[in-house]
């Protein structure tokens, strides 16, 4: 028998030992090294030098100013989401017979039973500001940066500028020259910049409905949301195309989105459904914890998202609305609208506002309760939204949906807030070419009657009494499903809502107007041939003087004024008031939309001196400038006969008690 070759055995053993050692080392190195292929950016991707849409604004596809490279985003990008002035959805052009989504419409149905997530830990907070991005934004220069007013210098394009403005309701040509990534002014209350919010916030799906929106404005909306949102919160932005027919909103839009964004997607509706149906379609396609509904012509301000989400993180049965700033439709100037008010309605279902409560004024950076949302911009838990039944899709096109949802939220176990530290700019459209109605028949009053019949109980009769008989002939449709939701959720009565939530609405907007303090023509004592007159001008114009009517107690409508119980001076049976907008000498007097908040529309008739005093301090008076025949507000002077006015008729007793609060017996 051959003896083993010891030398060979030793060599083989050493070779095997070395191989095993190398295998262990390599395996250990691989397991400790992350996969580092091309980094994934969620949201806006860094843009190549010449990427994006381009083209001549004179052709059908508008140009978009080249986006600058964006900050890299963190993995797991997620998302989220307006006032007297919030514009109601634009009427649309196409006639359709079926307002509801088609069978082939992309949909994601909600679960039958949705479980509420546990509230967030309110004790663990963090600063959500992106200071690096804010510092970078502050250094930007260019047209419209910092939200500043801008103009185009090329006189040769004035006709094109005007034509495009009338097509869109804003200066679309100027929009193409302003960066889609432009900076905005940080106009939050100083306390907002110091606030921290809970460290664990829910993810969001932002839902934006658009119909024939101008491309650069739509994309600026999307860029601003992504630029100023924490990437870990922004899960998706869903753009719901409500059957637009502008060519550039087709393939060009999808190409732009593919080149610049991730987690932004377009849902196309096969037919025109209107705002309510389109929002419902967007909600069905959403997958995040919170739904944020926004208009398609907005710009988000800094750190807008955490203050909108924290109340929902602490209580899932909560809806939250941001403060809505104004983006001027002519020059894109970004400015504050006001510092807040509580949403309400009058008995014609116009959206109105109530003053902030004293406790709210003490905490200007904290969310405050609001009875009614404006409807254009708000956030709500997806679970709670579907628990409430979502939107009533029996409501057609637009109108009444904000009241229906507000009533459901409050009466069915939820609450609603406005968040002062969450600010979003909104373009309020100016003059625009006529937009034909999408429906035959009165869909607006049908919507209102659906809301009233389901939710308003005996108070619905106040609404109907202001309808001039319109509600009598309106069929609200089948209300079985909506009434079943109210029963299933054991919702409270509308009387409870009016007494506990909107407790001051009946006083501010009574169903039956109290008598006016004075009414008739305003005849100038200095020149008794002349009376205050609109001169046939519509609102948003200066007032003037014209030959007085034969009977100043019952003059023609252009001279028929009333000092209403709201302490404003308005055209008889109109919602157009005398408004003074500056405090200089010879301040012009305008005819403006009545806002019922006093301030620059507060007037008092001092019948002893025959003076119309402006403002609660009564230091300025209405005056006729005799040579130019202009109507202005100046410092009161009892010896100036051109500051003296004969009112057609007035109630002395009521005027003597003018400063007292009205006590209404309703």
Swiss-Prot record:
Any one Gene Ontology BP term: protein O-linked glycosylation
Sequence ranges on the Lumenal membrane side: 32-666
Phosphoprotein in keyword set: no
Annotated glycosylation sites: 181, 285, 651, 657
Disulfide bonds: 192-421, 412-491, 531-548, 577-594, 621-636
Tagged with keyword Phosphoprotein: no
Keywords: Disulfide bond, Glycoprotein, Glycosyltransferase, Golgi apparatus, Lectin, Manganese, Membrane, Metal-binding, Signal-anchor, Transferase, Transmembrane, Transmembrane helix
Bias (Low complexity) ranges: 107-120
UniProt region (Disordered), positions on chain: 90-126
Pathway connected to this protein: Protein modification; protein glycosylation
Membrane topology according to the record: Single-pass type II membrane protein
Ricin B-type lectin domain residues: 518-648
Cytoplasmic side: 1-11
Transmembrane segments: 12-31
Binding site for Mn(2+): 295, 297, 426
InterPro entries found in the cross-reference section: GalNAc-T, Glyco_trans_2-like, Nucleotide-diphossugar_trans, Ricin_B-like_lectins, Ricin_B_lectin
Protein residues bound to substrate: 242, 272, 296, 398, 429
Broad EC category: transferase
Chief place of localization: Golgi
Region listing for Catalytic subdomain A, in residue ranges: 201-311
GO terms of molecular function: carbohydrate binding; metal ion binding; polypeptide N-acetylgalactosaminyltransferase activity
Start and end residues of each stretch annotated as Catalytic subdomain B: 367-429
Cofactor requirement: Mn(2+)
Known function: Glycopeptide transferase involved in O-linked oligosaccharide biosynthesis, which catalyzes the transfer of an N-acetyl-D-galactosamine residue to an already glycosylated peptide. In contrast to other proteins of the family, it does not act as a peptide transferase that transfers GalNAc onto serine or threonine residue on the protein receptor, but instead requires the prior addition of a GalNAc on a peptide before adding additional GalNAc moieties. Some peptide transferase activity is however not excluded, considering that its appropriate peptide substrate may remain unidentified.
Protein family (similarity comment): Belongs to the glycosyltransferase 2 family. GalNAc-T subfamily.
Stated name of the protein: N-acetylgalactosaminyltransferase 6
